[in-house]
Amino acid sequence: MPKMKSHSGASKRFKVSGKGKLLRQQANRRHLLEHKPSRRTRRLDGTEVVAAADVRRVKKLLGR
């Protein structure tokens, strides 16, 4: 049986932390930033933990 392939789109979007948590970037920080408040762009900085309802599905896509 060949190896399972991980979903390449999901592998670019999600990272697994050292403790096994799934991390993702926040949306709305790619473009059209000049009309968004600085407070909002700072708040959207950094990573966020994937919601508990989505963890099972994302792990399946990543082959974990």
UniProtKB/Swiss-Prot annotation:
**SUPFAM superfamilies the UniProt entry points to:** L35p-like
Q: Where is this region: Disordered?
A: 1-41
GO MF terms held by the record: structural constituent of ribosome
Which keywords does this chain's UniProt record carry? Ribonucleoprotein, Ribosomal protein
Record's GO cellular component terms: cytosolic large ribosomal subunit
Q: Does the keyword Ribonucleoprotein apply?
A: yes
Q: Does the keyword Ribonucleoprotein apply?
A: yes
By its UniProt entry, which InterPro entries does this protein fall under? Ribosomal_bL35 (IPR001706), Ribosomal_bL35-like (IPR021137), Ribosomal_bL35_CS (IPR018265), Ribosomal_bL35_sf (IPR037229)
Provide the GO biological process annotations.
translation
Q: Which HAMAP family match?
A: Ribosomal_bL35
Of which family is this protein a member?
Belongs to the bacterial ribosomal protein bL35 family.
The protein, known as:
Large ribosomal subunit protein bL35
Organism this protein belongs to: Nocardia farcinica (strain IFM 10152)
Which classification does the entry list for the species?
Answer: Bacteria, Bacillati, Actinomycetota, Actinomycetes, Mycobacteriales
* Gene field: rpmI
